[in-house]
């Protein structure tokens, strides 16, 4: 593995880890970063899947006690079974739509310009949602604990997650903001979003690796391993930071970041500085 490829792997791993669980779209950032770094060949898709796996394993490690409690409690505890059922219910819509429209979405939307429009649109939605939260004043959210989620709440969040099939919209942003609009406390919506990422990303990883297993090679293992570790470490730090951040802040700063980043992508693209308008 040459040093330039190692640097690209490290950068992309950190980008994935820092953006997977923030409402800013990790897929959108990887598409833009991959284009800037000229890391867009057939191995790039498999690499993206590997670093996403690194990021999700960071969440599994952060919530290992909770996950262990749920798994061990499935035979005997109703709350563990209800939580597991809610995760399954919320996961199904995105899986179904993803399988149906995967090729269309990748052909039409997996490039920087569509990502830019989605970033801006998502930022506007977050600003509207936060404005709506402020107008409600000190009204207490209906769902204050992730264990109090009902099946209908889970389904609503799962439907919101479908917007994340559009690169640039953000899976975490769709589920967190959607959850808040549907009556979930900010921390509850954020934690449920973390748990929803586990089956979605594990499923996507298994699907993509099965489909592109022939792209895996001994020569690529070093690159994949470096990106994986970078994604794990940065995602672990980011999850811990985000949980502290939301205790005292809303998501307005992320909304303005999305809008600014999206407009910058469009400005750079349409100015001719970089050729990514197609």
From Swiss-Prot:
PANTHER family: UNDECAPRENYL-DIPHOSPHATASE. One of its GO terms (cellular component) is plasma membrane. Belongs to the UppP family. This is Undecaprenyl-diphosphatase 1. GO terms for biological process: cell wall organization; peptidoglycan biosynthetic process; regulation of cell shape; response to antibiotic. Catalyzes the dephosphorylation of undecaprenyl diphosphate (UPP). Confers resistance to bacitracin. It catalyses: di-trans,octa-cis-undecaprenyl diphosphate + H2O = di-trans,octa-cis-undecaprenyl phosphate + phosphate + H(+). Keywords: Antibiotic resistance, Cell inner membrane, Cell membrane, Cell shape, Cell wall biogenesis/degradation, Hydrolase, Membrane, Peptidoglycan synthesis, Transmembrane, Transmembrane helix. Its EC number is 3.6.1.27. It is an enzyme of class 3 (hydrolase). GO terms for molecular function: undecaprenyl-diphosphatase activity. InterPro entries: UppP. It is found in: Cell inner membrane. It is a multi-pass membrane protein. Bacitracin is thought to be involved in the inhibition of peptidoglycan synthesis by sequestering undecaprenyl diphosphate, thereby reducing the pool of lipid carrier available.
